[in-house]
Each structure stands twice: as C-alpha cells, then as structure tokens.
Curated annotation (Swiss-Prot):
ATP binds at residues 234-241. The gene is atpA. It is found in: Cell membrane. It is a peripheral membrane protein. PROSITE patterns: ATPASE_ALPHA_BETA. The keyword Translocase applies. This is A-type ATP synthase subunit A. The keyword Transport applies. Has multiple subunits with at least A(3), B(3), C, D, E, F, H, I and proteolipid K(x). Component of the A-type ATP synthase that produces ATP from ADP in the presence of a proton gradient across the membrane. The A chain is the catalytic subunit. The lineage of its organism: Archaea, Methanobacteriati, Methanobacteriota, Archaeoglobi, Archaeoglobales. InterPro entries: ATP-synt_VA_C, ATP-synth_a_Xtn, ATP_synth_asu-like_sf, ATP_synth_asu_arc, ATPase_a/bsu_AS, ATPase_F1/V1/A1_a/bsu_N, ATPase_F1/V1/A1_a/bsu_N_sf, ATPase_F1/V1/A1_a/bsu_nucl-bd. Keywords: ATP synthesis, ATP-binding, Cell membrane, Hydrogen ion transport, Ion transport, Membrane, Nucleotide-binding, Translocase, Transport. Belongs to the ATPase alpha/beta chains family. It comes from Archaeoglobus fulgidus (strain ATCC 49558 / DSM 4304 / JCM 9628 / NBRC 100126 / VC-16). Its EC number is 7.1.2.2.
Length: 581
C-alpha cells in the first residue's frame, strides 16, 4: 500500500475506540488509510467539513492525537487469483498462517501480508491465442488450484476490451505477466477488486435449481435455490453453527466460503480440524479442497467484522464469475450488525430501533442482494447462495436484525430452543419455517426425483400441521379421548418427526441423506400410513397398530449405507404383522 503524493498525509485530531478523526487529509469515502506510527489499517467512513472519520480495523491502543494518518487513495480491495482455496483469512484478507509466522499466536498490529502467496508457482494453460479479441470478464486460461477446483483466469471486469498481443504458457507466480494486450495492458494471474462494489454480470436468472444440502428437513420441506438467500435465526445453543457446518460440508455447491463473523474461535477451529478429514460425497476428496475461510472471531477488532462479510461475498462472486455454484455461510450477521451499532454510536449518529443505525436494513439488503444465479460476462452460468445465521438476544425474533433479514431473504429456517431441549436436531421448527422457492423448484424435483415428490411433501406437511392442531386437545384431556383415526394420525406424525426429521449430524451415514433416499423414506412412511388405516378398518386396536413389529427396524434402516434392503425387509414385516398374508 504505497501512499500517494502530498496532501494524502494528515494528523489525528481525536480518537474514540476504533474510530479516529483526522484533519488535513485529502480523502474520499471508503479510502484505505494507515493510522499512527504502526500504520494500522483503517477505512474512511465519513467526511464532516475538513475532518475525516476513519474506522480502524485493528486495536487503537497507544495511538494519540497528533500522530500521522496516510491515505493510500485506494478503497479496501481483495486479491482474487490462485491460492484462495484452502486458505484462512482475517476480515481484511490477511492470511492467518502468514500472520502467525510473523507475530506468533496473537496477531500483532500494523502487519501487512498480501492475500495471495507471492512465491507459489502455478501452472497456467492459456485458452485464447495471440491476436484474439478478449472482453472484460472473459476466461483466458486455467490453473489447477486443487484436485477439485480448476481456477479460471479472468480478464478483470474493469479492463477495457482488447486484442491479445502476447500470451504465455508455463509456471508463474501471481505477480508474473501471463498476457499483454495490444494497448500495453498487462494481465496477471490475479487482480484486485474493491469489496463494496458488486462484481458485474450480464443478467440475473430465475432460481430454478435447488441447492441440495443432504439435510432432510431442508431439502424436503424448506428448500433453498442456487442463487437464493436463507436465514437461520435461533437462540443460543439451538444449533445454528452445526447447521451452518452441515451446509458447508454437504451442500452441492462447488465452492464454499465460510465467514466466521464475531463468533467463537473454537468453531472456526472445528472447521479447520474436520474439513481436511471429511470426504466430499461428490468428488471423494477432502472438503477443504473447495473451501475458503474468513475468520473474524469475537476477540478480533469489531470494525473488521463488516469488512469480513464484504471480503467473503467478493471472493464468492469471483468464483461465480468462473461459472461455479458458490455457497456462502455467514455466521453470524447479528455480530456484524452489533459492530455497525458500535461504530454508529461512535459516529454520534441518530440511533434507530434498539440502538441500531437507521441504515441497518439497507446494509443487510446490500449484502443479501449480491446473491443470485447469473449469466456471467464470459457467458457461463454461476450462482452465489447466501445463508446467514442470526443470533437474536434471548431468541426474540421480533428484534430488528431478524425482522430486517426476513424482509430480504426468501427462506426462513427457524431454530427452536424447545426442540433443542428435547434433543430434536436439526432443531428447525417445521411450523414457523417457510421457503418461498417451493413453487419454483417443484418442476425440478418432479423431473429429477419423482412425479410424486411434491404430493408426498404436501401430505407430510399436512400431517404435521394436523398433529400441531390436535396437540392442544391432547395436552388437556390426553390422547385416549381422541377418535381412533386421529390417534393413528398422531402415530404417523411421530414417525415423520422421529424417523424423518431427526437427523444425526455426527453419524457417518445419517449426516448426509441423498434426495433419492429422502424420497424413498417419505414414500415408505406414506405406505405405513396407508397400512395403519387399513388395519384400523380391519378391526386392529390402536395399541396393536402403534406397537407393530418392524417399526424399530424401519427406524434403524436410515443408518445403513445400503438402506434399501433393510427398509424393504422392515416394510414387509410391518405389512405382514398388520394385514397378514
């Protein structure tokens, strides 16, 4: 970060926590500055008369009025190129392994580290020839970054259209020139992009393909589309982070960007320990081979939380521009909103609801609206799916962050503390949650899974809804007072809840459930439901029906790698015991 000519150096007038007020400094909004003798990284967030307001992304202890402030004249940008995958960054794209080498286990202040390794060499294979015309965003070659991910090297979207004068093949570092345009523009393996500016695309496409997560309650009842937005609000201990980890592990995106924003450091450690060992069900390679981590834990500087969210989404858009499906997990957007509230307080702005700034809704929308399935500048189709966790204090969904998030996102997975207390995981409340993608995705499920999928889904939801209606009566007078047919319905609902909805995140087989297996299980439960009613008509008592032999074997079949024989044997046993030969 070189500093420009005179006028780009000023001095500190006042300091208030992470907010520094400087004077005598030429600056524009969102310019990157170096504050104090140690050159702490900061960003211009306001201009009042001759004074410049800077939020500092590092601890401001020891900085004093009169210290110099330098403006780099550049906005906060990330480096996009080979070397992103498998890396773990802080909120402003400094690689944490590099910072550890420089300053030990605790990050020192004012340390600069490039986002991409300058020494690593990458094998570049050109896809265009000398004399060919290239447009912004076009793919000019590839680099095999990991066994799973082939990085496509793009003409930066902010470069003018031109003709290739020279293009080279071979091993290069990210700083080496790999192609030259006729107007003299040099293209490298990487380019920089300002984090607050969404990357351009040709057009947005309708979200008609589901993001398969391998979690039964999500895929069957509340699916999210590729290029969609989802929120997971829930009180502490209800399983937000485990659900996010499950999505990062098993969703059928080609790239996963995981942002730990203001949450516990141990949760990021868990990702770092587990992902290299876990196998991707589609490629058979470690999950880390497709993951980028942005860690900004709760004990890191507050201001950098905002940067980490923008850094993560910009990296996701870069992979989208190559034609990949990207899933981005932000855990948790509430911590980012709290950071905004703190900075807003320091800026002495008029507070909105619960002390959050008035622009909370527009900032959240700015982030979620960068999701989408698009036609890229290169003509490919890529998508960014955003899943944001929200941590409302005390599990109160009426607080501003949750409410503003719900206005923007189309899928709401409501985590319920009562379900978590009953050890029902994933603790997603099937009565409160919703997905607005169900109608747009039903054709995909009908074509790729079964024509009956949507009918089965509707039937199961009706059973669960009916159970909730009967639950009030049951709690008052007990289930014995109900007619037999309704008691059968309660039994079927129990099977749906305990066999289908409960899923074990730490069981090697049950942690991921393919869509075909989900369909087979739901169809089998519908079959059992039909047999129950037939047995009731044939004169069997409710106790005989509920205690029929074979139900336990059926419940255990989902834990088998090859589940079909076990499930069929259990179904046959249930049929014989209920209806005879």
């Amino acid at each position: 970060m070189e500093v420009k000519e005179a006028g780009y150096v000023g001095e500190i007038y006042r300091i208030s926590g992470p907010l520094v007020v400087a004077e005598g400094l030429k600056a524009r909004m969102y310019d990157l500055c170096k504050v104090g003798e140690e050159g702490l990284m900061g960003e211009v967030v306001g201009l009042v008369g001759q004074k410049v307001l800077i939020q500092v992304y590092e601890d401001t202890e020891g900085v004093k009025p009169g210290d110099k402030v330098e403006n780099t004249g550049m906005p906060l940008s990330v480096e996009l190129g080979p070397g992103l995958i498998r890396n773990i960054y802080d909120g402003v794209q400094r690689p944490l392994p590099v910072l550890k080498e420089v300053s030990g286990d605790f990050i020192g202040r004012g340390i600069e580290a490039p986002g991409l390794d300058r020494k690593a060499k990458w094998e570049f294979k050109p896809l265009v020839k000398k004399g060919e015309k290239v447009k912004p965003g076009e793919i000019i070659g590839t680099v095999q970054e990991t066994e799973v991910v082939e990085q496509k090297i793009l003409v930066p979207p902010n470069v003018k259209e031109g003709v290739i004068a020279e293009i080279y093949e071979g091993s290069f570092t990210v700083e080496d020139t790999i192609a030259v345009l006729e107007d003299g523009t040099e293209l490298k393996l990487y380019h920089k992009w300002p984090v607050r500016i969404p990357r351009p695309y040709v057009e947005k496409l309708p979200p008609v393909v589901p993001l398969i997560t391998g979690q039964r309650i999500l895929d069957t009842f509340f699916p999210v589309a590729k290029g969609g937005t989802a929120a997971i609000p829930g009180p502490f201990g209800s399983g937000k982070t485990v659900t996010q980890h499950q999505l990062a592990k098993w969703s059928d995106a080609q790239i996963v960007v995981y942002i730990g924003c203001g949450e516990r450091g141990n949760e990021m450690t868990e990702v770092l320990e587990e992902f290299p060992e876990l196998e991707d069900p589609r490629t058979g390679k470690p999950l880390m081979e497709r993951t980028v981590l942005v860690a900004n834990t709760s004990n890191m500087p507050v201001a950098a939380r905002e940067a980490s969210v923008y850094t993560g989404i910009t990296i996701a858009e870069y992979f989208r521009d190559m034609g990949y499906d990207v899933a981005i997990q932000a855990d948790s957007t509430s911590r980012w909103a709290e950071a905004m509230r703190e900075i807003s307080g320091r800026l002495e702005e008029m507070p909105g609801e619960e002390g959050y700034p008035a622009y909370l809704a527009s900032r959240l929308a700015e982030f979620y609206e960068r999701a989408g399935r698009v036609k890229t500048l290169a003509g490919n189709i890529g998508s960014v799916t955003v899943v944001g966790a929200v941590s409302p204090p005390g599990g109160d969904f009426s607080e501003p962050v949750t409410q503003n998030t719900l206005r923007i996102v189309k899928v709401f997975w409501a985590l319920d503390a009562k379900l978590a207390a009953r050890r029902h995981f994933p603790a997603i409340n099937w009565l409160q949650s919703y997905s607005l993608y169900v109608d747009t995705l039903k054709d995909w499920f009908a074509e790729n899974v079964s024509e009956e999928w949507n009918e089965l889904r509707r039937w199961a939801m009706e059973v669960l809804q009916e159970e909730a209606n009967l639950q009030e009566i049951v709690q008052l007078v007990g289930s014995d007072a109900l007619p037999e047919s309704q008691r059968v319905l309660l039994e079927v609902a129990r099977i749906i809840r305990e066999v289908y909805l409960i899923q074990y995140a730490y069981h090697p087989v049950d942690t991921y459930c393919s869509v075909q297996k989900q369909y087979d299980m739901l169809k089998a439960i519908k079959q059992i439901n039909d047999w129950f009613y037939q047995a009731l008509e044939a004169g069997k008592t409710i106790d005989e029906i509920a205690g029929v032999e074979g139900l336990e074997e059926f419940a255990r079949a989902k834990f088998e790698e090859d589940y079909k024989p076990a499930m069929e044997a259990a179904l046959e046993k249930i049929r014989k015991n209920l209806l005879g030969e």
